[in-house]
Amino acid sequence: MPVSRSASPRGRALALLAGVALVATIAGSAAAARGGNANAGFKTSVPAMLVPGADAPAGVVIDPIISVGDTLNSGFTFDSIPDGISLTVNGRGRADLWVNHETSLVPFPGILTDFTNSHVDRLVMNQHSAGILSATDAIPSDANYQRFCSNFLAGPAEGFDRRILFTNEEATDVVNRTGLAWPAIPAVGSDPEQAGVVVALDIKSGEYRTIYGMGRHNHENSVAIPGFDELVVLSGDDTFSAPSSQVYSYIASDTDAVWNDEGALWAFVGEDGFNDYGDLADGDDITGHFIPVPRDVAVGDQNALETWSNANNVFQFIRIEDIAYDRNDSNVVYLADTGEPRAIPDPATGRLMRGPSGTMGPYPNGRIFRMVLDEDDPTQVDSLSILINHDPLGPGVADALHNPDNLETTANSLLIQEDTGSHNQFDLGAGPSARVWQYIFATGELRAVLEVDQSLDEDPAYDVGGFVARAGGWESSGIVDASAIWGPGWFLLDVQAGSLILESEPGFLGPNPVIFEREGGQLLRAYIPGA
C-alpha cells in the first residue's frame, strides 16, 4: 500500500496508523505575507531558526519563509527534514524552488520513522516578498525514494540543453519501489531494490527517472561541472561506514545521453602512492585520474561498488558530503569531507580503517579539498590539495570548523554548512550551535556568518518531544546562491531541527509497530554582505 501526500498530514498514513496523536501547534497558516499584501503569498510566523554568527559582518538579514507543519490554503503542508534547494526565476515576479525532504519510511533509529518517503517540493515564490504562492510535489512520496539529501539543477551553464534536477538518495536500505516501501516484503509491496541512486527530474515536463549508471552509493549530491565537450557530473559517497568514501564522475555526450543513462561512471585514483585521506597532509599537492567503472558494477549494489573500488585502489576519502565548482574557474572543484573520529590507520595495510566505538582518531573535524580538473580532459586531475584543514585542532574546539557538509560558491566566497558530530557538540551555552562559514577567496579568511538558533527546542507551543539537543544537535543545510532572485549576497537555506518534535503517533508499517514523528525545520533566506 503506497503512502502518498494528502491535505492532512495525518491522512498520509491513515491506512497504517492506530493510536492517538500528539501534535504541537504550529503558528503558521495560509495567511498573507508580512506587510498585508494579499498577493504576496504565505510567510511563516514561526521565529527564525538562524541568527547572525560570531563573525557576521554588519547588515546580515535573516528572513524565515516557511516552517515544517505550515499549511497553505490548498492543503499543502511543508514536511520535515528540508534539505537540498534549487531555484529558477521565471521573469514574472516569481521564482520556483525545488526543495528536498530527507524523509524515509525505513525506521531509524529503532522504531522511529517519518510520515513519508522522501519527496521534492516545487514552491512558487513571490520574488518581492519571498512569500509562497503555491506548492506541489515534483517527485512524490509514493515514488518510494529514500532520504533525498542535496540537489543540483543543471542547465545551459553546465552544458545541458534543458534543465535537469539531480536529487540523490543517501540510503543503503532495500525497499519496495511499488506499494509500501518498507518492510520490503511481498505482502506490502513489490519491485524491491537497494536504495542509493540518483534521480533526474526534467523540471519542464515534470518527468523523473532513476539514473542507475551514476552508481549506487550514499549520494549526497550530483553536481554538473561546466566547460567540457561532454557533460560531466561529479558525486561523492556520503558513506555510513566511514572511512570508505570515493569521488565519482559520470560522463555523457549530451543531455539525452544523461536522461537515457547512456553515460559511463568513472572513479578517482590518486597517483604517486597517495590513496587515502590520511596520506594527504597540509601543503601536499597531488595529481590523479579517473578510471572507468564497469557497467555491471555501476548498476549493482553498494557492496559491489565498494569492493571494486578497493580492488582498484580508488582514492578513499573519509566521507564526502557536498561538492561545488568555482564560479571563476569552473574546472576547480571543492569537496567537503566531514571527517570521522573513528578513522585510524590500519596497522596491517596503512590505509584508514574504522576503529571501535569511542575511538578518537586524528580526523575529527573534516576538511575542504580543492580538486583541479584538466581543462581539456575531465578524467585527468591536475591537482588535489587541502584548502581548509581543522583536524589538527582536535574535537570540541569552539573556533574550529566542525564537520563540513553542504557547500555553495559565489565569485567571492565558499559557503560551508556544518553537520556536527556528537564529539563537536556542547552543553547549551558552553559552545556554538551548527554554523555557516564563509571562506573569502581573496584573503583566505574563514568566518562564522550564521548560526542555528535552537531556542524553540522543548518550547511547549511547538515541541511534544522530551529530548533537549546539545548545541550543534540541529543543523542548517541546502544553501544555494539566490542572487538571481534578490541580488548578490542573498542565499536560500534551511534548518533541520531534529529534536523539535511537532507530531508523534504510534502505528504500523505492514506488520511492524513504529512511531511516526515529524521533526521541525524551516526554509529561510539570508543576506550576507560581501558573500
What residue spans do the PLM features occupy?
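Cleavable N-terminal signal peptides
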Residues: 19, 30-31
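Bacterial N-terminal signal peptides
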Residues: 16-25
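N-terminal secretory signal peptides that target proteins for export/translocation
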Residues: 1-9
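Gram-positive Sec-dependent secretion signals
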Residues: 9-15
